[in-house]
UniProtKB/Swiss-Prot annotation:
Residues 1-82 are annotated as: Interaction with SIAH1. Residues 38-59 are annotated as: Disordered. It comes from Bos taurus (Bovine). The modification N6-acetyllysine is found at residues 10, 21, 87, 120. It comes from the Eukaryota. Coiled coil: none annotated. May be involved in calcium-dependent ubiquitination and subsequent proteasomal degradation of target proteins. Probably serves as a molecular bridge in ubiquitin E3 complexes. Participates in the ubiquitin-mediated degradation of beta-catenin (CTNNB1). Monomer or homodimer. Component of some large E3 complex at least composed of UBE2D1, SIAH1, CACYBP/SIP, SKP1, APC and TBL1X. Interacts directly with SIAH1, SIAH2 and SKP1. Interacts with proteins of the S100 family S100A1, S100A6, S100B, S100P and S100A12 in a calcium-dependent manner. This is Calcyclin-binding protein. Signal peptide: none annotated. GO terms for molecular function: S100 protein binding; tubulin binding; ubiquitin protein ligase binding. Phosphorylated on serine residues. Phosphorylated upon induction by RA or at high calcium concentrations. GO terms for cellular component: beta-catenin destruction complex; cytoplasm; nucleus. The modification Phosphoserine is found at residues 3, 36.
Length: 230
């Protein structure tokens, strides 16, 4: 394009020279018209050149850098509360500000014996809670979640309505049952006491065993003498 402009510039200068020398009106009018034509063409060429330069400059600009949305690390939720009605087991999770995040940022997936909660990008963090081995089966279709002020409420629909859950999970049930005394509370109280003493004796050290043996001998001697204070 620079070469074309240069040629037009030379044509314009030559027309100007001829126009200065021309004396006849018809010739001068023709040269004046040609001069205007060349000037207009030069103006258009220059505008096109400027436009292309601007486009090249715009294309050379670096693309805007969009900062990635980070959700930080994931916090495992361990604190929660739960209760139940005839139809639902209700799990309450307290998360300050959770009601302010977009609805799609709070996700809960259900299976017949589990659920998992994921809250994304809450104050720069994600929060996760996975509960497996629910005590009893739940209805996946009938289960849901609700987001309230600073709280996520998970509603697990009982498959068998009007049944009571003593524990939330099977694991919790097994742990609690292991903590119960080994003797049967429905048996005779004296038998239960003997079982307790037997367990203490088996688990105790030598001093404990000597103490129990001594108490046992003294008790037997008193019973032989008719003393029933023991």
């Amino acid at each position: 394009m620079s070469s074309a402009l240069e040629e037009l510039q030379k044509d314009l200068e030559e027309v100007k020279v001829l126009l200065e020398k021309a004396t006849r009106k018809r010739v001068r009018d023709a040269l004046t018209a040609e001069k205007s034509k060349i000037e207009t063409e030069m103006k258009n060429k220059m505008q096109q050149k400027s436009q292309r330069k601007a486009e090249l400059t715009e294309n050379e600009k670096p693309a805007a850098v969009v900062a990635p949305i980070t959700t930080g690390y994931t916090v495992k939720i361990s604190n929660y509360g739960w209760d139940q009605s005839d139809k639902f087991v209700k799990i309450y999770i307290t998360l300050p500000g959770v009601h302010q995040v977009p609805a799609e940022s709070v996700q809960v997936n259900f299976t017949e014996r589990s659920f998992d909660l994921l809250v994304k990008n809450l104050n720069g963090k994600s929060y996760s809670m996975i509960v497996n081995n629910l005590l009893k089966p739940i209805s996946v279709e009938g289960s849901s979640k609700k987001v309230k002020t600073d709280t996520v409420l998970i509603l697990c629909r009982k498959k068998a309505e009007n049944t009571r859950w003593d524990y939330l999970t099977q694991v919790e049930k097994e742990c609690k049952e292991k903590e119960k005394p080994s003797y049967d509370t429905e048996t005779d109280p004296s038998e239960g006491l003997m079982n307790v003493l037997k367990k203490i004796y088996e688990d105790g050290d030598d001093d404990m065993k000597r103490t129990i043996n001594k108490a046992w001998v003294e008790s037997r001697e008193k019973q032989a003498k008719g003393d029933t204070d023991f």
